[in-house]
Every structure is written in structure tokens, then in C-alpha cells.
């Protein structure tokens, strides 16, 4: 179904915007906590959280990326889109997009892509996200791995 009236936009925003923005912030917090727990990552990777955005760097590979969040509609469903991007030659390059639904489903690349994770109960999201991010950066020739 598509958006047909202003209420199709305002009702989901009123009901779910704060929830989805909070979940996006929770994702960033969980990535930082995962990084802090994994001792092997500290020597080669830097992860910082600032203003509800995450910055990931691998200095030896000259890799740096940031995240940004936005709300978007898929049909009449409001979702949170978390994008990881980098810059090159004054241009932004999207590396990976992740999606969070109001039902707590988390996915990579598209809203319907598999696997779908349970955002609040699946503890494999963080390592999967780091893996997807580095594979996507490699596929786009941003890093070589």
C-alpha cells in the first residue's frame, strides 16, 4: 500500500518516530559496547560514538566511516534507516544500509532481505554488522580484504 493521505504520514510519525530514533541510538550503543568487549579489535580498529552517530576507523587500511540515521516509509510502514558512509574526493560514498522496523526486526541492504534479526534478543547483530560493513567496503573497493 502507498501513502494516500496526510494521515498516512503523520499517524506513523506520531506513533513510531521516537521509538525508531531510540532504536537507532540503541544500535550505535550496542556497537560501541561490542567493540569495548572485544579486546582483539582495539589494536587495529577505532570505534567512537558522538552525537548519536558512530565513527569507525581502521587507520592501517586508511578506512573511516560514519553513520547517519533517518526515518523512511516502505509502503505505509515507517522504518529507521541506518547508513554507513565514507567520503572520497568531496563525495559521499554509501557503504551499507541497515533497517529497523517498528516490530523490532533488523536487516541489511533492504527491509525484506534475509536474514532478519530480532533487534532486542539476537546477540549476533553486532558482529554481523561489522562483517557486513567490511565486506561491503571491500566490494566497493574502499578497502582491500
Question: What are these model-predicted stretches?
Answer:
Residues 21, 25, 32, 43, ...:
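Generic alpha-helix signal with a bias toward terminal, lower-confidence helices
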